[in-house]
UniProtKB/Swiss-Prot annotation:
Gene3D superfamilies: Ankyrin repeat-containing domain. ANK repeats lie at residues 2-32. Keywords: ANK repeat. Transmembrane segments: none annotated. The keyword Membrane does not apply. It comes from Rickettsia felis (strain ATCC VR-1525 / URRWXCal2) (Rickettsia azadi). This is Putative ankyrin repeat protein RF_1157. It comes from the Bacteria. Pfam families: Ank.
Amino acid sequence: MYNTTPLNFAINQENNEEVIKYLLANGANPRLALVDIIEAGNNNALNLLMKVAPSITVDEVFPQVMAMGMRRFFQAVQNKDLSAIKDFI
């Protein structure tokens, strides 16, 4: 289970932007949530976080997403999981 921060929990529960903005305004750290969101592969949560947290940029997120994708690809190859490998093609 990821949801290690209140912000990440709120994002994963698909709360509206106002809830997310409230947490950010009251000291929530978007970078802590970012790590869990990327590891969970939750694209909707990632898009929402980038939309409401101006400090999170594509330049910051892209390398982490690529690294996670490569780890998943090599894991799929190691496990000989053809359906997972096809997702990358």
